[in-house]
Amino acid sequence: INNLKSRNFEDYFMRNHYIFKNHLSIIRKCYRMFARMITMKITSKDIILDTDERIRMQSEPVQLPLSNEDRELLQAMLDYVRNSQDDEIAEAEDLQPAVGIAAVQVGVLKQMIAVVIPYEDGVDEVALVNPKIISESVQNAYLDNGEGCLSVKGEHPGHVFRHARIKVRGYDLIQDKNVTISAEGYFAICLQHEIDHLSGTLFYDHIDANNPWKSDDEAEVI
């Protein structure tokens, strides 16, 4: 500061510009480093409910290749579902247990879903962009105790009939390529539940209001 007082600022800057330039370069490098460290996180507070009009809106197709923003969001969705199934992490980060999530559930109207189904000997997990059901079985399946949803707080008891087997086409973030997935049973039900969100459909829309617990002798009960 004393030097600035004793000489012309322009002359001072011209003599020492390399110092400023070097400092600016360091600042930029630090910013990029911290930007990579700071990743998007989703908590239960980010989940919108069925009282929010956006949950009933149509989600838009996502342009490929994915932008950094879309990639980060889908990864955050996948991380939410994975972490919600870990009791310690779920409690520490305030996560509701989940097996799937759609982008619209965090207020983003884009065709993206994440599903994670753990088994004793492995896991079925996908993070899909623009998922589309391309074939489905005639046979139905349903969860014996009914379905639930992160965006639904009220009670909606009843059976939700879905296709027992489906094939889904889309881009999978985990494999970083376009895929065709064959799913059956619980995995198929969860995929259909999340894909429904992309058209503004909720699980209780499928429940028969007059006979919510009706059964189907030919359907697979899960």
Give, region by region, the residue ranges found by the protein language model:
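Positively charged
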Residues: I27-I222
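Short hydrophobic targeting helices and cationic amphipathic motifs
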Residues: L4, F9-F13, H17-L24
